[in-house]
């Protein structure tokens, strides 16, 4: 049996402010820093160690991984960073408050933008200051790969090649792997692993800073999955994520 650990970054500044974040490079809040420490503690106390770690090019995920590994006394773990693990690009919604956007467009429309599979939010333009092509970290990307907005389907399409070519072979080679990433990039992977339908993925909500363990067979098919930590607190955290895009939240 092989194990894979997925970790959504700790609470970010824009999580706290209930804003659409996407590829905006915001940092962790004090609560997010503590969540990352707690994730590392849970992993250490449950006997986890890692041969390789993967994360995105966004500091909230990178810092979460650093802190968790530090708490485990495993800062020496090799880390690969790749844009394909970035959060879904929320286009013109990036920076907007989710509840205020729901008041303007309605809860149902915002839920579709946030949680549907194949519907993109409104796009930015290449002249928008939020366009990733202006950011040095993406200087080696082809212009065709740089998103103006993404659906979850788009996120799956750019995540899975990296999973298949880089991450999955490591797990099959008996390497112990952790992926520290984002709500939607992790949903993309979970959809693939658990073979979740396009409709049911709407209801998949991943809390910040809580390790999610997958037990996999030799073909990387899930045998079991579970969060580490207190079940009541995990349930509350999942509910909080589900309520972020509601006008009354």
Swiss-Prot record:
Q: Which GO terms describe its biological process?
A: gluconeogenesis; glycolytic process
Reply yes or no: does the keyword Isomerase apply.
yes
Please report the organism this UniProt entry assigns to the protein: Nitrosomonas europaea (strain ATCC 19718 / CIP 103999 / KCTC 2705 / NBRC 14298)
Q: Subunit comment for this entry?
A: Homodimer.
List the GO molecular function terms: phosphoglycerate mutase activity
The catalysed reaction is: (2R)-2-phosphoglycerate = (2R)-3-phosphoglycerate
Name the UniProt record assigns to this protein? 2,3-bisphosphoglycerate-dependent phosphoglycerate mutase 2
Q: Which residues bind substrate?
A: 8-15, 21-22, 60, 87-90, 98, 114-115, 183-184
Similarity-based family: Belongs to the phosphoglycerate mutase family. BPG-dependent PGAM subfamily.
NCBIfam families from the xrefs? pgm_1, PRK14115.1
From the UniProt record, give the pathway where this protein acts.
Carbohydrate degradation; glycolysis; pyruvate from D-glyceraldehyde 3-phosphate: step 3/5
> Which InterPro entries does its entry note?
His_Pase_superF_clade-1, His_PPase_superfam, PG/BPGM_mutase_AS, Phosphogly_mut1
Q: Where is this site: Transition state stabilizer?
A: 182
Recite the lineage of the species: Bacteria, Pseudomonadati, Pseudomonadota, Betaproteobacteria, Nitrosomonadales
Instruction: Cite the entry's keywords alphabetically.
Output: Gluconeogenesis, Glycolysis, Isomerase
């Amino acid at each position: 049996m092989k194990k894979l650990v997925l970790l959504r970054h700790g609470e970010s500044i824009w999580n706290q402010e209930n804003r659409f974040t996407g590829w905006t490079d915001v940092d962790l809040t004090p609560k997010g820093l503590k969540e990352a420490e707690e994730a590392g503690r849970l992993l250490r106390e449950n006997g986890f160690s890692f041969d390789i770690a993967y994360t995105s090019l966004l500091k909230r995920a990178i810092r979460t991984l650093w802190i968790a590994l530090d708490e485990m006394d495993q800062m020496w773990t090799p880390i690969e960073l790749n844009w394909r693990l970035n959060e879904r690009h929320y286009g013109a919604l990036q920076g907007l408050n989710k509840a205020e956007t729901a008041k303007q467009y309605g809860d149902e429309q915002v839920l579709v933008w946030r949680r549907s599979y194949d519907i993109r939010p409104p796009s930015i333009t290449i002249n928008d200051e939020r366009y990733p092509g202006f950011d040095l970290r993406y200087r080696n990307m082809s212009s065709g790969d740089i998103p103006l907005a993404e659906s979850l389907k788009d996120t799956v399409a750019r995540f899975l090649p990296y999973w298949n070519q880089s991450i999955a072979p490591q797990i099959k080679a008996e390497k112990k792997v952790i992926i520290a990433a984002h709500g939607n990039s992790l949903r993309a992977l979970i959809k693939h692993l658990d073979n979740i339908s396009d409709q049911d993925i709407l209801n998949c909500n991943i809390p910040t800073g809580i390790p999610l363990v997958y037990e996999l067979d030799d073909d990387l098919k899930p045998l079991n999955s579970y969060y580490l930590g207190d079940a009541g607190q995990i349930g509350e955290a999942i509910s909080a994520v589900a309520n972020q895009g509601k006008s009354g939240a």
